[in-house]
């Protein structure tokens, strides 16, 4: 009996247990906000929601939607350019620590959506006419994503994206950097 008790105590006290994170088919909901093109939040911002599903090697598939708005100064007013995009992509796990608390991913995504220039109004208050029009947009994004787990089900994220979109008249490249929260749902 003494021997069995000693084996039990050793089994419970030896080694270090770490959380079960990034297991295959585990899913999380990510909510992110970001600065766009180095502009202040009052002039350019984005926000999005993403569903991520982990694969057997710790990488993840992501599917979600995003809203991006950038205001362009014109005379004494601003002209808003808004993009509504859907994203689907794959993020490869590049680095993790032994305790599975910190993860670094590099990813590539396909994007498709719609861009609205001045909410469809082509005539400005001073009588000028906008040449840029609303359009369907498509393209891709490169992403660097860092996750730090605060608990087994909650992670703080940092992201840097470079989006390249075609089909619009207002610029093809947008750099975004932001933060977000991830909640593991299963």
Question: How does the language model describe each region?
Answer:
Residues 19-70, 182-186:
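Short glycine/proline- and aromatic-enriched beta-strand/turn motifs that initiate or cap beta-hairpins
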Residues 20-29, 57-61, 100-106, 134-136, ...:
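Outer-envelope beta-barrel architecture signal
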Residues 27-33, 47, 61-65, 88, ...:
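Membrane-embedded beta-strand positions of outer-membrane beta-barrel proteins
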Residues 35-37, 73-79, 126-132, 164-168:
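Extracellular loop and loop/strand-boundary signature of outer-membrane beta-barrel proteins
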Residues 52-125, 183-186:
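Gram-negative (and chloroplast) outer-membrane scaffold detector with strong preference
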Residues 68-70, 145-186:
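Predominantly the C-terminal beta-signal and adjacent terminal strand-loop region
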């Amino acid at each position: 009996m003494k021997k069995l008790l000693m084996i039990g105590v050793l089994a419970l006290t030896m080694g270090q247990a770490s959380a079960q994170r990034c297991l295959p088919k585990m899913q999380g909901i990510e909510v992110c906000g970001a600065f766009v093109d180095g502009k202040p939040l009052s002039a350019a911002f984005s926000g999005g929601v993403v569903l991520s599903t982990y694969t057997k090697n710790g990488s993840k598939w992501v599917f979600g939607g995003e809203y991006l708005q950038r205001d362009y100064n014109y005379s004494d007013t601003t002209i808003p350019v808004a993009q509504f995009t859907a994203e689907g992509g794959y993020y490869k796990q590049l680095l993790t620590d032994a305790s599975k608390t910190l993860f670094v991913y590099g990813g590539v995504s396909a994007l498709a959506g719609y861009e609205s220039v001045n909410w469809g109004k082509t005539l400005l208050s001073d009588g000028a006419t906008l040449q840029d029009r609303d359009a369907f947009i498509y393209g891709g994004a490169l992403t660097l994503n860092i996750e730090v787990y605060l608990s087994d089900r909650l992670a703080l994220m940092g992201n840097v994206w470079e989006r390249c979109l075609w089909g619009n008249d207002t610029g093809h490249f947008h750099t975004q950097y932001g933060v977000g929260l991830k909640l593991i749902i299963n």
